[in-house]
Amino acid sequence: MSQSAVSFQINPVSKVQEQSIQQKINLKTKPLGALGQLESLALQIARIQGADQPYIANPTMLVFAGDHGIAAEGVSIAPSEVTRQMVQNFAHGGAAINVFCRQVGFKLEVIDCGILTPIEGVKGIIDQRLGAGTGAIHLEPAMALETVDKGFAMARDLIERHHQTGCNLVAFGEMGIGNTSAASAIMAAIMQLDVIDCVGRGTGINQETLARKLMLIELALLLHQSALTGPKEVLACLGGFEIVQMTGAMLAAAERNMLVVVDGFIATAAALVAVTIAPNVRDYLIFAHQSEEQGHLRMLEFLQAKPLLSLGLRLGEGTGAALALPLIQAAVNFYNQMASFSDAGIEAVV
């Protein structure tokens, strides 16, 4: 049975209240613009929610996991088996993302989108498998086009479940050995860049491995050149099961007027695809950080994004997105709680 095409209806964020929101920010007891990027973040959140008192409710970190056929060629510092081991680590609470989520108050959910071997009977892992790892993209498509739509449908259901609990902010992380290769290929295809401008060292590969990674991604783009006719086709030819479901979940979250917090290089590649499918998604995206991966800055610039943090992170998992949550909450809190000049009886400062 074929999967019917999944589409999303995403409204642009209204600009009707933009002037009044900006005026409220300007009249807080501070010089104009003195809270820097927190001010533009507060403006974005207030516009999305269209409320006098914006708020963060049930913030949820979604970590999508999947394996990649190209990893068998040795493009990473670790073999594919590490994907499964790390997913188990997430489930047992022992990874960096677990530590940070506990610290900042994120609910964490781990989604198996298609690691090589499923993990049976472990609480906290959501089964949304699209297969047992993707095809090796330098030899064949990563997946069928129908699989992309199946992944989008699963992702929409996932977001709907969280939306029903009152969640209004979702953050996106991932785990998948080889997924920087898939993300680099997606970036090159959509942004029409040379591979060398998109490929980096991932979690820390040496020069020899980097050269092999470059060659294989070049081969993949050459192999699928005629099939890369749209963003879904790019995902089918070059993507990963976790990247597909991240893309679909970002689209679904924007459709539900939720705040979407984007982590690093892989998550930004998913955001790039989502914005290509539905440009209005861009209004809902909050970019957590600029990672150490060399292509990430180029993608952020392409998306006209100014990330909140720059910490030299290159771990993935959603770690940067988790660390950004206190800043997002701070933007909401100053908007709601900080006195205006008239409230405080202070003469306005320009």
Swiss-Prot record:
Its recorded reaction(s) are: 5,6-dimethylbenzimidazole + nicotinate beta-D-ribonucleotide = alpha-ribazole 5'-phosphate + nicotinate + H(+)
Which pathway does this chain act in? Nucleoside biosynthesis; alpha-ribazole biosynthesis; alpha-ribazole from 5,6-dimethylbenzimidazole: step 1/2
Short name of any one Pfam family annotated for the protein: DBI_PRT
For whether the record's keyword set contains Lipid biosynthesis, the answer is no
Q: Does the keyword Transferase apply?
A: yes
CDD domains tied to this protein: DMB-PRT_CobT
What keywords tag this UniProt record?
Cobalamin biosynthesis, Glycosyltransferase, Transferase
* Residues of the active site: E317
Q: What class of enzyme is it?
A: transferase
Gene Ontology molecular function: nicotinate-nucleotide-dimethylbenzimidazole phosphoribosyltransferase activity
The residue range of the signal peptide is none
One BP term from GO: cobalamin biosynthetic process
> Its Enzyme Commission number?
2.4.2.21
Q: What does this protein do?
A: Catalyzes the synthesis of alpha-ribazole-5'-phosphate from nicotinate mononucleotide (NAMN) and 5,6-dimethylbenzimidazole (DMB).
Q: Which family does it belong to?
A: Belongs to the CobT family.
Please report the name of this protein according to its UniProt entry.
Nicotinate-nucleotide--dimethylbenzimidazole phosphoribosyltransferase
Q: Which organism is it from?
A: Shewanella sp. (strain W3-18-1)
